[in-house]
């Protein structure tokens, strides 16, 4: 959740999709409740002709992102292609069941899975493309992204989007 990023995209036509637990923060910020749709983990949704699923996103061995908060990652389906954006999470029973074509997974460690854990998850769920995220600003380094790509099975294409 980033108020800075919300400020960059909010306008009179913006719809914000968030877990229920974050609703109060957005309302306090002055965002119109009609512009907000709340979601729960592990459900299917259709908003403005965009189909998506939510997947629980939480830590299993640290306290930063507790499961009880109901935070989520998203699988967005566009033209039949399934894009998984994991969110801030560790490997969980829920995300080990994800079926996707493209996966965006955190590799920074500390608040999320590290690059080794992320590669393990990706090698298990087997998307066609895997893209490391959540590194290079708060925690994690570009080397984590490089090491993540190195650990992927050969049939999975790893792509680094953040470059210096």
Language-model region placement:
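Active-site environment of divalent metal-dependent phosphoester hydrolases
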Residues: 1, 23-26, 43-46, 61-62, ...
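Di-metal (Zn2+ and/or Mg2+/Mn2+) metal-binding site signature of metallo-dependent hydrolases
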Residues: 1-12, 20-25
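Short amphipathic alpha-helical segments and helix-helix/interface helices
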Residues: 5-10, 73, 95, 118-122, ...
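Short active-site oxyanion
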Residues: 10-16, 81-83
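Binuclear metal-ion centers of metallo-dependent hydrolases, dominated by the metallo-beta-lactamase
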Residues: 15, 30-46, 119, 123, ...
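Core dinuclear metal-dependent hydrolase active-site scaffold
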Residues: 37-99, 113, 162-164
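Metallo-beta-lactamase
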Residues: 75-128, 132-140
């Amino acid at each position: 959740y980033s108020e800075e990023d919300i400020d960059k995209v909010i306008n009179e036509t913006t719809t914000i999709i968030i877990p229920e637990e974050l609703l109060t923060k957005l309302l306090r910020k002055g965002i119109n409740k009609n512009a907000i749709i709340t979601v729960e983990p592990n459900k299917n949704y259709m908003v403005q002709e965009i189909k998506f699923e939510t997947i629980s996103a939480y830590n299993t061995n640290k306290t930063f992102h507790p499961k009880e908060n109901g935070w989520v990652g998203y699988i967005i389906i566009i033209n039949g292609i399934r894009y998984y954006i994991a969110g801030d999470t560790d490997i969980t029973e829920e995300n080990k069941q994800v079926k996707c074509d493209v996966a965006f997974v955190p590799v920074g460690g500390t608040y999320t899975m590290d690059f080794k854990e992320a590669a393990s998850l990706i090698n298990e769920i087997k998307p066609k493309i895997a893209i490391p995220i959540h590194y290079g600003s708060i925690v994690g380094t570009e080397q984590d992204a490089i090491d993540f790509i190195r650990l992927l099975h050969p049939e999975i294409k790893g792509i680094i989007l953040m470059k210096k």
